[in-house]
Amino acid sequence: MFPAAVGVLWQSGLRDPTPPGGPHGIEGLSLAFEKPSPVTALTQELRFATTMTGGVSLAIWMAGVTREINLLAQASQWRRLGGTFPTNSQLTNESAASLRLYAQLIDLLDMVVDVDILSGTSAGGINAALLASSRVTGSDLGGIRDLWLDLGALTELLRDPRDKKTPSLLYGDERIFAALAKRLPKLATGPFPPTTFPEAARTPSTTLYITTTLLAGETSRFTDSFGTLVQDVDLRGLFTFTETDLARPDTAPALALAARSSASFPLAFEPSFLPFTKGTAKKGEVPARPAMAPFTSLTRPHWVSDGGLLDNRPIGVLFKRIFDRPARRPVRRVLLFVVPSSGPAPDPMHEPPPDNVDEPLGLIDGLLKGLAAVTTQSIAADLRAIRAHQDCMEARTDAKLRLAELAATLRNGTRLLTPSLLTDYRTREATKQAQTLTSALLRRLSTCPPESGPATESLPKSWSAELTVGGDADKVCRQQITATILLSWSQPTAQPLPQSPAELARFGQPAYDLAKGCALTVIRAAFQLARSDADIAALAEVTEAIHRAWRPTASSDLSVLVRTMCSRPAIRQGSLENAADQLAADYLQQSTVPGDAWERLGAALVNAYPTLTQLAASASADSGAPTDSLLARDHVAAGQLETYLSYLGTYPGRADDSRDAPTMAWKLFDLATTQRAMLPADAEIEQGLELVQVSADTRSLLAPDWQTAQQKLTGMRLHHFGAFYKRSWRANDWMWGRLDGAGWLVHVLLDPRRVRWIVGERADTNGPQSGAQWFLGKLKELGAPDFPSPGYPLPAVGGGPAQHLTEDMLLDELGFLDDPAKPLPASIPWTALWLSQAWQQRVLEEELDGLANTVLDPQPGKLPDWSPTSSRTWATKVLAAHPGDAKYALLNENPIAGETFASDKGSPLMAHTVAKAAATAAGAAGSVRQLPSVLKPPLITLRTLTLSGYRVVSLTKGIARSTIIAGALLLVLGVAAAIQSVTVFGVTGLIAAGTGGLLVVLGTWQVSGRLLFALLSFSVVGAVLALATPVVREWLFGTQQQPGWVGTHAYWLGAQWWHPLVVVGLIALVAIMIAAATPGRR
């Protein structure tokens, strides 16, 4: 990552001393780059597996990142298609310029980019769904800015206080689900739709995973060491959409429902309902819900909530999907973990004060800190899990290498695999598969209703006994499935080890995937040593041959396999043990690998043997270079390749000999199964990848004062709901999402290994320029700005002196291009920091005026949101500034991100928001069915008062002076009516007086916080005095004929003399708790 002394993940930034667009501005860019060069076998394929996670209004920042990924993907599509840029493109000039820049950079680096696997959690699920849909349909996502600016308005998301039922504070189905269901099928077509591609490439491989949380879990079972039945309730839900699903227009409602179901933060949004096999019809503003059985492994309908409530990231299935993707050229795999912030970074210069026992946390502070801790720990757990996976992959790769090294020393004809090791492998793998199948089977059976008639969805009576308490269904199923798998994988006594391709094929897909992984490990070591175009092309051909040897069919989900098996009449009439046996047989049939696939796998390496031998022999023998240098890496890779080749044997490089390919196949089988026999049963497939966290905790050259998500994003406030409050706040977060996203993508694209390869192939090594100078020159041609004389100012680190980024620093960073003995860095952050300005200038040209307009005139025809004077002054300066340095520099002065709810306290928008939120919250509290009857009258009164107050605030448009006047008038008239003896007048007057008092308090709070508590005290006194009014007195204490509310609902109050004292004590306790919740007030 970018250098940082305080642990923050730095990232490329922006500043441009050149005129608008620089010498390579928008017009210059369009003239400089007409069409990309053709894609060849030497072109590198950069594949992004993108995981998005983050809550509620932080979705807007993630949407900005999504927009940049979408532009990069479209640029890659342009390079694959070739030709000139379409003249009928609907992109804005600035977006088209950004797309061209991405196309120029990947053309310079000779790569294409593929965003093929995506996953989303919580609000990240919405953006992941949009990005996945755009990939398959060729849509342009520029329009999601307006989608989020409109959809995210808090005053629109808040439920109407007049609703009869208020299950949450915000509309989930009526707003979020409805908007997504409407907009997903109508995304604007981009300049490179799939219809322009050849038939085979029209539906690019795409897999989308979206998580959710089940409110009523699905139960499976297992037994402990003593045979005791343990109920395992699984609350994790996972939606899966493939490219085939995403290409069908009728999938859009299911995709919208999945995204809405993941973004269902409790209390804020109501739970989402998932139909299973039968959808639900449209009801009011809620669209029709489709059946979700094809897209999830659930077994019945469910109410679900936010996907981020549990540690529910589909890491395992994501890695498996990565492994299954075939390749035809060199592939670099990167996992983009998109999260607005993983938490505040420790700053030794500003260490927070230690916790003090004499300063206890209040009720609200403790609650908010607890929620923040859960969120932060969840994100950190994800990153740790991925990092742990990487560490495990490295350890397993090392173990595989040492096994090959050991096997190479064995006597000729002695195999690495022994019968005992094969037995261990069979037992471990069969046990693992049996546990998975048993869990899926019992999960299905636990949700089946008792058998009543011929329905195939019910539980057969013959299975019921083993599923009751004290039954041994788990043990019976596991043992039977294990036995069936072991029988299928058994060897004849006379030949304890498999040798022919047909014998290897009996071990199914798990063994084949392991052997395929071993073959790819050999090729990865060879790629490190490749220097010429011919070597790269040869290795790319071998990689494609390995993937082409056998491509697994799209296997159905286990839940589908179980449901199909359980519906067969013959199975239902038999025993549960027979059902488990049939399930294992169906599973083995589904994972069958043909024998000739093993032969083709072996032949791929046999054909490549001369190339591999030549690469190992030509590597440098110098091992004294620094550990991370190119020479040292070549030395290590050569040693690994020689070890594998020594184990695999000697081959002429032709698969004509019928012995060569089968021999190579069983040697791969031996290496794979021996390694797996020594690993835990739950060991995953070895699939290495780079992990890059894309966050807002980054710095920039144009805005050096903005370094963290807490500083930049309004969505970090109010437990991540902040950006919903104001349109300008949403526009601010969207802009920062694009700025941050562009910088991160440039950083990832500038892979030092690829840059070194390009410089070695294209730079003139005999010319006057060094490789580093040649590459910097190419980046300047692309659009990177020239350096100012003192360099770009950088923020001071650790209280030290100010620093400047200079061209010499970049040349030093790129020194590895000319000296193979220098360490090869993991990334080149300073170069990316400087280059990313070319993109970020285009972003500012498109977004800065838009942000200013949301401050001054957020929506034409509507009253503007109130903003502080500093924000309005800044917005005016932005609109008046000419494009170029002066305008870009205004980003560092951006006051929008610095606005807070406190600074907006006196605004009409705040008054309207508070009034509506209070009325909605009162309605939500009154909608709780489990409320004791004694609490219902006070809540009804509270709802009446807050609803009346909201209506008056709507009429006064939230203006403080008008609100106070209206409140005072209602207060006077209400008191006059309340003291009358007529019941109707008394009740109406009391409500009017309460509403008036509430309005006076609200209006006064807008003007001055100092008067707030005085007015609240006045309101309390007024409430006490109201007890003397006839209406309240009779309502509470009744008359001779009627007992009143106290006599009906609180008769115990007068039953003993000390009961009223208890009530007074409880009131005092509440007051103490409120004081404890705000310990800062004295």
UniProtKB/Swiss-Prot annotation:
<dbReference type="InterPro" id="IPR019894">
    <property type="entry name" value="Patatin-related_protein"/>
</dbReference>
<dbReference type="InterPro" id="IPR016035">
    <property type="entry name" value="Acyl_Trfase/lysoPLipase"/>
</dbReference>
<protein>
    <recommendedName>
        <fullName>Uncharacterized membrane protein Rv3479</fullName>
    </recommendedName>
</protein>
<keyword id="KW-1003">Cell membrane</keyword>
<feature type="transmembrane region" description="Helical">
    <location>
        <begin position="1012"/>
        <end position="1032"/>
    </location>
</feature>
<dbReference type="GO" id="GO:0016042">
    <property type="term" value="P:lipid catabolic process"/>
</dbReference>
<feature type="transmembrane region" description="Helical">
    <location>
        <begin position="959"/>
        <end position="979"/>
    </location>
</feature>
<feature type="short sequence motif" description="GXSXG">
    <location>
        <begin position="120"/>
        <end position="124"/>
    </location>
</feature>
<dbReference type="GO" id="GO:0005886">
    <property type="term" value="C:plasma membrane"/>
</dbReference>
<dbReference type="Pfam" id="PF01734">
    <property type="entry name" value="Patatin"/>
</dbReference>
<dbReference type="InterPro" id="IPR024282">
    <property type="entry name" value="DUF3376"/>
</dbReference>
<keyword id="KW-0472">Membrane</keyword>
<feature type="transmembrane region" description="Helical">
    <location>
        <begin position="982"/>
        <end position="1002"/>
    </location>
</feature>
<keyword id="KW-0378">Hydrolase</keyword>
<keyword id="KW-0812">Transmembrane</keyword>
<dbReference type="Pfam" id="PF11856">
    <property type="entry name" value="DUF3376"/>
</dbReference>
<feature type="active site" description="Nucleophile">
    <location>
        <position position="122"/>
    </location>
</feature>
<feature type="domain" description="PNPLA">
    <location>
        <begin position="50"/>
        <end position="319"/>
    </location>
</feature>
<dbReference type="GO" id="GO:0016787">
    <property type="term" value="F:hydrolase activity"/>
</dbReference>
<keyword id="KW-0442">Lipid degradation</keyword>
<feature type="active site" description="Proton acceptor">
    <location>
        <position position="306"/>
    </location>
</feature>
<feature type="short sequence motif" description="DGA/G">
    <location>
        <begin position="306"/>
        <end position="308"/>
    </location>
</feature>
<dbReference type="InterPro" id="IPR002641">
    <property type="entry name" value="PNPLA_dom"/>
</dbReference>
<keyword id="KW-0443">Lipid metabolism</keyword>
<feature type="transmembrane region" description="Helical">
    <location>
        <begin position="1057"/>
        <end position="1077"/>
    </location>
</feature>
<keyword id="KW-1133">Transmembrane helix</keyword>
